[in-house]
Design a protein with these regions (language model features):
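A broad, low-specificity signal for short, low-complexity segments enriched in glycine/proline
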Residues: 5-10, 32-40, 64-69
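Compositionally biased, intrinsically disordered low-complexity regions
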Residues: 13, 36, 41, 46, ...
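Polar/charged alpha-helical tracts
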Residues: 18, 22-29, 95, 99
Length: 129
């Protein structure tokens, strides 16, 4: 199963966009996709990019020098359940994000069209313990 298929199987709203595969490919081509695996099996996928603080998260924009990590999408199960396995996948995805972007000022999650803003370092300390 590919990362795109994993997201589509989860049924998240983004997977039903008419341009979803194009959108995903752009992020993947720009190294903005994290994939957590358990052996050969995908256990989670995240799409994230950097923006300047307060900048509108317009699609197809990534600012390497941005001080905000904007997480467009996270999927850690295909059935929407939260389990110890899905929580471990989320920790893995956050570790990938840290490796890719390093420390930032904020981390923003897009959850159902609503944005949740957190202090990056405080969030990572809590999430990765």
């Amino acid at each position: 199963m590919t990362a795109v298929e994993y997201i589509e199987l989860s049924g998240v709203p983004e997977s039903r966009w008419p341009n979803f595969r194009e959108w995903f490919k752009w992020h993947q081509d720009n190294y903005l996709v994290g994939i957590a695996k358990d052996g050969d099996k995908i256990s989670g996928v995240a799409v994230a990019r950097c923006l300047h603080e307060g900048e509108e998260p317009v699609h197809y924009v990534h600012r390497q020098d941005g001080n905000t990590a904007f997480v467009d999408l996270t999927v850690t199960s295909t059935d929407g359940s939260s389990t110890p396995y899905s929580r471990l996948a989320m920790k893995t995805l956050l570790s990938i994000l840290w490796s890719r972007f390093g420390p930032r000022k904020n981390i923003v999650f897009n959850r159902g069209g609503k944005r949740k803003v957190y202090d990056y370092m405080k969030f990572m300390r809590k999430a990765l313990l």
